[in-house]
Amino acid sequence: MARSLKKGPFIDDHLMKKITKLNSEGKKTPFKSWSRRSTIYPDMIGHTVMIHNGKAFVPVYVNENMIGHKLGEFAPTRTFKGHGGDKKVAKK
């Protein structure tokens, strides 16, 4: 279910403070964030955010096409090992 338009996008306050501080200083250093639920907004373009996937931090470089999506969409939490192979044993 989509978020109501009257509410607007959700951004954690601590993440907003980090971005505004980096933008005011003119720095583009990567920073860690556990906030997978925050929406990507235009001030984040050009920054590298290290998103936690439950085990490690995944570097995500933010560009224009990501605006409006959640940060967690770009840091997968599950590793796909592949479907089962052919279980038939070949006769020799």
UniProtKB/Swiss-Prot annotation:
Q: A single Gene Ontology molecular function, please?
A: rRNA binding
Reply yes or no: does the keyword RNA-binding apply: yes
Sorted alphabetically, which keywords does the UniProt record give?
A: Ribonucleoprotein, Ribosomal protein, RNA-binding, rRNA-binding
Quote the Gene3D superfamilies the UniProt record gives. Answer: 30s Ribosomal Protein S19, Chain A (3.30.860.10)
Extract the signal peptide range.
none
This protein's source sits in the domain of life called Bacteria
Q: Name one Pfam family in it.
A: Ribosomal_S19
**Biological-process GO terms, alphabetical:** ribosomal small subunit assembly; translation
The family annotation for this protein states: Belongs to the universal ribosomal protein uS19 family.
The job of this chain, per UniProt, is described as: Protein S19 forms a complex with S13 that binds strongly to the 16S ribosomal RNA.
Name assigned to this protein? Small ribosomal subunit protein uS19
- Organism of origin is Leptospira biflexa serovar Patoc (strain Patoc 1 / ATCC 23582 / Paris)
